[in-house]
């Protein structure tokens, strides 16, 4: 099974590399790079596995005795383990560059099993290192390379997470042409459906759900808003589902009860058994150019495209506030449900 793997260089990336002799052979030389450990802990929560790939020139020779190397190396691993970080595999090439061995980075012989058995997901794996050889290794593996030094560890974290749990989706029919981009970790918000009140409601999902959301819709509004609202819901739901990927680690369940002068509630389960229970009554037929009956249809289409069981209800006097309350409650429940809480799938069945 393909995994999300970070192939990580050691010296100069994970730990500081001394410029005097480029060897970490004493405990005094062992220093972690700034934010390396917090970043790896964060990425671990998102299901990434770690593989160390390091060139250690002349390891085991009189100029670099193996026992000296192991003192600092084992201490480094002990510290990382105490913080909750372990490497799935550790590959070390001990040769000098002029020996022209098959295992030295950027060659891939050390990672032959990963390549042969397709053990890493090329779309969601990365090489992190401080040298050009690390970037060439990334190219040889068919994954993206992130160069430490040009990027800090926090910037590396942002780069990885912005590409992870993100998705784009386009839905084109005879009635509508819709483009949606979702980043569950936050990002840009830009919504243009041609229906101002609908835009305002969709913005509530982005703002209160803490997600990046870009939607553009060209629809047959000269007829009415039905096709645009329905197809935006279908495209948005499909895009959120795509961004969640394998759903490993997510809380799965969400519940929200925001209160203004109206009371709105939402309960959500990413169970892949779509269902909607909706209880809301509006006095007005329209809010702006949005038909109030289309609010229920929006959530119906959205729940089926997302694959969620969704319970929504609202009580209050002001129709605008009631509609906004429903979208806010949905957003808050979504934020809770997609939050990474563990490294496991929230299902005894092993699939959701």
Swiss-Prot record:
**Where are the catalytic residues?**
9 (nucleophile), 11 (proton donor)
Region: Imidazoleglycerol-phosphate dehydratase, residue numbers: 165-352
Q: Could you tell me where this protein is found in the cell?
A: Cytoplasm
Q: Which InterPro entries match?
A: HAD-like_sf, HAD-SF_hydro_IIIA, HAD_sf, His_synth_bifunc_HisB, HisB_N, Histidinol-phos, IGPD_sf, ImidazoleglycerolP_deHydtase
UniProt xrefs under Gene3D superfamilies: HAD superfamily/HAD-like, Imidazole glycerol phosphate dehydratase, domain 1
User: Which BP terms does GO give this entry?
Assistant: L-histidine biosynthetic process
Where do the segments described as Histidinol-phosphatase lie? 1-164
Q: Could you tell me the keywords of this UniProt record?
A: Amino-acid biosynthesis, Cytoplasm, Histidine biosynthesis, Hydrolase, Lyase, Magnesium, Metal-binding, Multifunctional enzyme, Zinc
Q: List the disulfide bonds.
A: none
Q: Does the keyword Hydrolase apply?
A: yes
Residues recorded as binding Mg(2+), renumbered to this chain, are 9, 11, 130
- Which residues of this UniProt protein bind Zn(2+)? 93, 95, 101, 103
Cellular compartments per GO CC: cytoplasm
What is catalyzed by this enzyme?
D-erythro-1-(imidazol-4-yl)glycerol 3-phosphate = 3-(imidazol-4-yl)-2-oxopropyl phosphate + H2O; L-histidinol phosphate + H2O = L-histidinol + phosphate
Q: In which pathway does it act?
A: Amino-acid biosynthesis; L-histidine biosynthesis; L-histidine from 5-phospho-alpha-D-ribose 1-diphosphate: step 6/9; Amino-acid biosynthesis; L-histidine biosynthesis; L-histidine from 5-phospho-alpha-D-ribose 1-diphosphate: step 8/9
Which PROSITE patterns does this entry report, sorted A to Z? IGP_DEHYDRATASE_1 (PS00954), IGP_DEHYDRATASE_2 (PS00955)
The EC code for this enzyme is 3.1.3.15, 4.2.1.19
CC cofactor: Mg(2+); Zn(2+)
Would you identify the family this protein belongs to, as annotated? In the N-terminal section; belongs to the histidinol-phosphatase family. In the C-terminal section; belongs to the imidazoleglycerol-phosphate dehydratase family.
Family matches, as HAMAP family: Bifunc_HisB, HisB
Q: What is this protein called?
A: Histidine biosynthesis bifunctional protein HisB
Species source reads Campylobacter jejuni subsp. jejuni serotype O:2 (strain ATCC 700819 / NCTC 11168)
């Amino acid at each position: 099974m393909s995994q999300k793997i970070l192939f990580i260089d050691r010296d100069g990336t994970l730990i500081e590399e001394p410029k005097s002799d480029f060897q970490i052979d004493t405990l005094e030389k062992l220093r972690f790079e700034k934010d390396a450990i917090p970043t790896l802990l964060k990425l671990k929560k998102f299901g990434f596995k770690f593989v160390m790939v390091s060139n250690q020139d002349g390891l085991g020779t009189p100029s670099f005795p193996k026992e000296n190397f192991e003192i600092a190396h084992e201490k480094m691993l002990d510290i990382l383990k105490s913080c909750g970080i372990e490497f799935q595999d550790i590959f070390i090439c001990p040769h000098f560059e002029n020996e022209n061995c098959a295992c030295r980075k950027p060659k891939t012989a050390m990672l032959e099993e990963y390549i042969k058995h397709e053990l890493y997901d090329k779309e969601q794996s990365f090489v992190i290192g401080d040298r050009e050889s690390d970037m060439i290794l990334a190219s040889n593996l068919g994954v993206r390379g992130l160069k430490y030094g040009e990027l800090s560890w926090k910037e590396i974290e942002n780069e990885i997470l912005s590409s992870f749990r993100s998705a784009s989706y386009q839905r084109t029919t005879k009635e509508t042409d819709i483009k949606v981009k979702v980043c569950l970790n936050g990002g840009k918000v830009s919504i243009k459906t041609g229906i101002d009140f609908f835009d305002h409601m969709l913005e509530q999902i982005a703002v209160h759900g803490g997600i990046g959301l870009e939607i553009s819709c060209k629809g047959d509004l000269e007829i009415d808003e039905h096709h645009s609202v329905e197809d935006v819901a279908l495209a948005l739901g499909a895009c959120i589902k795509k961004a969640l990927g394998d759903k490993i680690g997510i809380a799965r369940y969400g519940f929200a009860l925001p209160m203004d002068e109206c009371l709105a509630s939402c309960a959500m389960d990413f169970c892949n058994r779509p269902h909607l229970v909706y209880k809301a009554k509006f006095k007005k037929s329209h809010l702006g150019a949005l038909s109030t009956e289309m609010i229920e249809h929006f959530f119906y289409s959205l729940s089926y495209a997302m694959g969620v069981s969704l319970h929504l209800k609202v009580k209050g006097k002001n129709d605008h506030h009631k509609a906004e309350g429903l979208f806010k409650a949905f957003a808050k429940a979504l934020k809770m449900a997609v939050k990474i809480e563990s490294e496991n799938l929230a299902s005894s069945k092993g699939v959701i």
